[in-house]
């Protein structure tokens, strides 16, 4: 059964946009080339928010990707760059990536907040705005 991962990150300042985009593009390319990857979608939302949606053959494939290469190097930086960060994972019948509305619903219902050093009021209250597609 395919394993789906959705992440939403919001940069706390535009000053982090260029380095974030470099890591995001490198991580996206890394994901597409990783063992077990079935699909990758990215969304640049409003208010410096960014979404990723990936499908994997199994959760171990996603975890191997997450702990290697560009993605691994980016993760520690996000503690300072982001003021909102959330992630959700689930299994589904098909390998087709869900729409952003379903990804948002899963993030709200099943997601968890990731640690950031300077959380916004939305991060503290666990409010996750709907994506603007």
Tell me what each language-model feature is.
Residues 59-87:
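An amphipathic, aromatic/His-enriched active-site/gating alpha helix that lines ligand/cofactor pockets
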